Curated annotation (Swiss-Prot):
Protein known as: Rho-related GTP-binding protein RhoA-C
Gene transcribed to yield this protein: rhoac
Propeptide segments, given as residue ranges: 191-193
Lipidation (S-geranylgeranyl cysteine): 190
Organism from which the protein derives: Danio rerio
Keywords, comma-separated and alphabetical: Cell membrane, Glycoprotein, GTP-binding, Lipoprotein, Membrane, Methylation, Nucleotide-binding, Prenylation
Length: 193
């Protein structure tokens, strides 16, 4: 039986860990150097609930310079990974300010998984000191859960691409969301207006 094909698009602020998450999941290696993304695509095979799924992973650039290009990634999307970084409260703030309106405009009815990246930095002393200088602290798990409820996400997960903690679970949940969206008969898929 042929694998079911699904398209996943990952969005979120620049440098919040999107590309690392995709690379660790698809290639099982952590890139040590930061390279801002233009557009990269990967394909990964995943099995969930005894179903073989071929997941097309569409990376996007979070930087504002790409705001007009990014929508080209959205058509026919089955699931969105909307990311923020646990060491950047500002990136969480941009979830309702920027990312949710953009995604809901181009991808109405497509399930969203909210993902807190860089979980390993929550208790990192250097990170905490740097944030304290700006009167901030790392994002708490309940803040992520509250945001997921607020934007009506399919689910909320935290992970660390660096330690691989929670990475597989993110893509399992995303695959389940993509499969369920089809089952419910919703007209999912993104529109380019």
């Amino acid at each position: 039986m042929a694998a079911i094909r699904k398209k996943l698009v990952i969005v979120g602020d620049g440098a919040c860990g999107k590309t690392c998450l995709l690379i660790v999941f698809s290639k099982d290696q952590f890139p040590e150097v930061y390279v801002p993304t233009v557009f990269e695509n990967y394909v990964a095979d995943i099995e969930v609930d005894s179903k073989q799924v071929e997941l097309a992973l569409w990376d996007t650039a979070g930087q504002e310079d790409y705001d007009r290009l990014r929508p080209l990634s959205y058509p026919d999307t089955d699931v969105i990974l909307m990311c923020f970084s646990i060491d950047s409260p500002d990136s969480l703030e941009n979830i309702p300010e920027k990312w949710t309106p953009e995604v809901k405009h181009f991808c109405p009815n497509v399930p969203i998984i909210l993902v807190g990246n860089k979980k390993d930095l929550r208790n990192d002393e250097h990170t905490r000191r740097e944030l304290a200088k700006m009167k901030q602290e790392p994002v708490k798990p309940e803040e992520g859960r509250d945001m997921a409820n607020r934007i009506n996400a399919f689910g909320y997960l935290e992970c660390s691409a660096k330690t691989k903690d929670g990475v597989r679970e993110v893509f399992e949940m995303a695959t389940r969301a993509a499969l369920q969206a089809r089952k419910r008969g919703k007209k999912s898929g993104c529109l380019l207006l």
